[in-house]
UniProtKB/Swiss-Prot annotation:
Part of the 50S ribosomal subunit; part of the 5S rRNA/L5/L18/L25 subcomplex. Contacts the 5S and 23S rRNAs. Keywords: Ribonucleoprotein, Ribosomal protein, RNA-binding, rRNA-binding. NCBIfam families: L18_bact (TIGR00060). The gene is rplR. It comes from Rhizobium etli (strain CIAT 652). This is Large ribosomal subunit protein uL18.
């Protein structure tokens, strides 16, 4: 039986393999969640560059949030990354949830990014 770490890595690889097959040159919105914060970045895999990023560790968000580990914080990060993506000229992305299930904070970030103008 695989360890928890191996199972997470296998699930993340499975998701990323699927993303690469459907990307068609679109950048990906990669999301990482820790116990205290949430991070999002839009990555152009063709050029190997990060086009936009946002996290709950940023000073302008930290002051307005009670904690970085709830759905309100995730929604704020989603709106901010969508705003920065539109400034960078990105409107279509592929959502990369990694090994995280589409629920809770991950879902809140994705829905806020959609409301902010990103399509995926």
């Amino acid at each position: 039986m695989a360890s928890r770490k191996e199972a997470l890595a296998r699930r993340a690889n499975r998701v990323r393999r699927h993303i690469k097959s459907v990307a068609n040159g679109r950048p990906r919105l990669s999301v990482h969640r820790s116990s205290k914060n949430i991070y999002a970045q839009i990555i152009d895999d063709v050029a190997g560059k990060t086009l936009a990023s946002a996290s709950t560790l940023e000073k302008d968000l930290r002051g307005s949030l009670k904690t970085g580990a709830d759905t309100a914080a995730a929604a704020a990060v989603g709106k901010l990354v969508a705003e920065r993506a539109s400034k960078a000229g990105v409107s279509e992305v592929v959502f990369d949830r990694g090994a995280f299930i589409y629920h809770g904070r991950i879902k809140a970030l994705a829905e806020a990014a959609r409301e902010g103008g990103l399509t995926f």
